[in-house]
Design a protein with these regions (language model features):
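N-terminal and secondary-structure boundary signal
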Residues: 1-345
Length: 345
């Protein structure tokens, strides 16, 4: 048997490089692992989700995970702007290729995680709450969002119970604020009732703390930001706010930009005159729902659009922003019999 430490990084990041830069790869080998595995390099197996709520077509999952004798998840305790928490259940998002990861990356994310637990279920979940993240997680650029005095480790065999206890420790009402937990319980995948969970060790009340919630709203975030927003789902809002937070937390990175305008969502009304004059000012048309306005600025297509996430637009021309955006989109993996979602080119 082998001990394999596997992971998949976020958009625009190479997991193999991340293993080297953050030291996890070297630490894993020192600790007795046989190898580390960037999941984007693993062979994919097409799997049907039983009784799906949102993943109605097959998903392609890493063969190594599907065939493992034991799966141990080691999530970092973090607030997530879309799902409130990202603990054991949310780890399954990292098993997906980027097409499936971005798909259903909005209001249906909770149901998606319930579906994923039906095909990938950890035998043990160990939550690292030593230095957890609050606020604009899962990758907040704000230093104050990193909590450096928490020092909690949480572990259990039932990922739903682990997440329920974890959410409670973070100050959430698990059943009412984290729909994936009650969804998993209703589906018979675990226990989300705190009264039915045997918590061993330090009592919850001794470590419980209110973690600041994340926020994906774009209204009033900065005087230079203007938003024309119709019916916009959480996916495009999440990716837009994620990228924008980098500049809100580090104003010097866009000090030469005078105006940033976003057009997004269905049925949005837009003025006849917009100020798109890079690198002084930019208009971003975000997501497929706003495609009718794509000639008004830089069009960032997709559902959800990955929008400002790693776009790094200040100082770039429209053409340079578009090129970087498309280069960040994942290449299709050639899997026989696997039909990928259509993407806007």
């Amino acid at each position: 048997s082998q001990i394999i430490v596997a992971d998949r990084s976020s958009i625009g990041a190479d997991t193999g490089e991340a293993f080297e830069v953050n030291g996890v790869g070297a630490a894993a080998m020192r600790g007795g692992a046989d190898r580390v595995l960037p999941l984007e390099q693993d062979e994919r197996v097409v799997v049907d989700v039983p009784d799906p709520q949102v993943l109605l077509r097959p998903v392609a999952l890493p063969r190594t995970m599907l065939e493992a004798d034991k799966l141990i998840y080691v999530p970092k305790m973090k607030v997530h702007k879309l799902t409130n928490i990202t603990l054991a259940m949310k780890m399954n998002q990292g098993s997906l290729d980027w097409y499936d990861a971005i798909r259903n990356h909005g209001p249906d994310m909770h149901a998606k995680m319930v579906d994923m637990l039906k095909v990938l279920r950890p035998d043990l979940s160990i939550v690292d709450g030593l230095w957890p993240m609050q606020g604009q997680g899962p990758g907040s650029p704000y230093p104050e969002d990193l909590i450096k005095d928490f020092n909690v480790i949480l572990a259990g065999k039932d990922p739903v119970a682990v997440d329920t206890v974890g959410a409670t420790i973070m100050g959430f009402d698990a059943k009412h604020e984290v729909p994936m937990l009650r969804g998993a319980e209703v589906a018979g995948l675990g226990v989300a009732n705190l009264d039915q969970i045997d918590v061993v060790g330090t009592p919850i009340d001794q470590v419980k703390r209110h973690f600041r919630r994340g926020n994906i709203n774009l209204v009033g975030v900065d005087p230079k930001v203007r938003v024309y927003m119709g019916r916009t789902c959480d996916g495009c809002l999440h990716f837009t706010r994620t990228g924008l937070d980098v500049y809100l937390a580090n104003p010097h990175l866009w000090e030469d930009v005078e105006r940033v305008t976003f057009i997004m969502g269905r049925d949005v009304e837009v003025p006849d005159e917009l100020d798109h004059d890079p690198p002084r000012s930019y208009v971003f048309v975000v997501g497929d729902c706003a495609a009718q306005f794509q000639d008004r600025g830089v069009f960032l297509p997709g559902c959800a659009s990955t929008s400002m996430h790693f776009t790094l637009f200040p100082g770039k021309t429209s053409e340079e922003v578009v090129e970087r955006y498309h280069n960040l989109q994942p290449p299709k993996v050639n899997i026989e019999g696997y039909v990928f979602p259509e993407t806007t080119s």
